[in-house]
């Protein structure tokens, strides 16, 4: 290690001397960038013996991750970083013993904390300050277990047709899925770059945007709550509800149910919504979803209804002919409850001029009723990350799998096993909570 360091140092000196000897007309000097990082924890925990925090820097262009260690409430400078866009994700754990010593309270298990800053563009020769505040996650309710949105090979498998969403009872008691709502939410895909300029595909002349580059829903035509429009709600493109009378669908602890746009066996020949007959050449690269508990039957697609799967109630069908997930990964997913979800208001996007408006409407969903949220954002090839539509209390970061017919999904990590029941990790930070894997209904993410 010592000799490697000396060799690196000699090489660095040699490179410096070489460029010093060159004229000013040669290639311009390129400076690395740096981050000044400070991670804080709630006051009741800040005297914990464990003062070390693991911080992951994720380069959104190269997908490379670097893990560093910092100390609570102390500035740490990370120097000589390649100039690029980064996600910065902090993770910290307190043991049950320390929790009791600090607070006097008994805990069921260790408490995991996290924080994140996403889409941070570094500048040459400049220091970027990032302050993170760790918060504890945890949902004593249903959570998203697996979201498979990418689809399989569109020529030799099932394309977009074999997607599914799996929802899991992460508690120690039986929950009833009746009237649980799920929404696929919209986002603005192209906002501001970190230099303050609009992305070349952004449309600021067409829509109202916030300073963060998200849709400014306060400007939507007829908005009833302009003051809270951007912070108190998310906006659903497709909104569904589990049927039932309140006691129809008991889900035991550690059990799950699957919602499939089409509850079919895609390993065998099937018919698409367009009436096309498909015979998969790669049956091992698609799924049998005929055992899904629920399917989603849009008007006109009744012939594809699996009579062994119960139909989800369609509250808002969006602008597609079927439940279509964003295969390139630019969408949010929320689970929520509401006493009268069919009466939630619908809005057009915030157009500057209504002559540009298309008829697509989005259901306004109160954040207060959301029990789990996952934001999916696949970085573009150049590393650009779409502006987060979710407030950080719903999801501090985002998750993604390889997109576009990759036959990959995101699945929630197993945090621990308690008397045979798997408890899934829920930090409200999808970058830490989920991993990419080959989709497999009812399967769990692989252990570390």
Give names to the regions the model predicted.
Residues 23-32, 38-52, 56-67, 71-74, ...:
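Intrinsically disordered, low-complexity linkers and terminal tails enriched in Ser/Thr/Pro/Gly
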Residues 1-9:
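Bacterial N-terminal signal peptides that target proteins for export
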Residues 18-21:
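C-terminal motif of bacterial Sec signal peptides marking the signal peptidase cleavage site
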